[in-house]
Amino acid sequence: MSGQNILKCKKCQLEITNKIITNHNSDTFHEQCFVCKLCSTPISDPYFTDKETGDFYCAKCEVIRNDQSKPLRESLGFCSLCYKYFRQNEDILTIDLERYHIGCLKCTICKKGINNEKYYREKMTSKLSNYCCEDCFEKVDKCNGCNSMTLGQTLLAMGKNYHANCFKCFKCSEIIKPNSPYSINKQTNTPSCQKCN
């Protein structure tokens, strides 16, 4: 057998001398080794692979398996971004009382993963908040009202950028809506609404 490639079974690591079964990852198996973990029947398409254990499941048993783990998955909760359930013992990123899979939450600018320590969040312009890593935060435009980044629609007033909800009267704190009249206090360089003029 020298000089020849010996095919080994991915599961039992023994040489394959008869029928070869190849899965989607090009791994090779004995026919009797490539079976469903639950019912032990030979695997055929479609089949499912458990990412944690590497075990294979036929389509019928995958349905059973999901039904069995549903209460556990619901008790663990789901990611606020992709809405997929968390797995048991999975690392979870918690930010502002919302929970995410590690890797789901990314910087809006550079697309690198956001960690739990150094991030900035823009809450004003969209239902789904924009997040920014510390490095990119130094480069983006900031709202003059809240000093948060302005990645969505902004209001240009007094030569500065504002979130629409951040441009407020200095005296009464009412939001000054776009195209509404306002005056500027020359001493403090702050806006006042028409009511407080």
UniProtKB/Swiss-Prot annotation:
Keywords: LIM domain, Metal-binding, Phagocytosis, Repeat, Zinc. The keyword Metal-binding applies. Signal peptide: none annotated. GO terms for cellular component: phagocytic cup. One of its GO terms (molecular function) is zinc ion binding. It comes from the Eukaryota. GO terms for biological process: cortical actin cytoskeleton organization; filopodium assembly; phagocytosis; positive regulation of phagocytosis; response to imidacloprid. Disulfide bonds: none annotated. Involved in the regulation of phagocytosis. May repress ChLim and activate rab21. This is LIM domain-containing protein F. It comes from Dictyostelium discoideum (Social amoeba). The gene is limF.
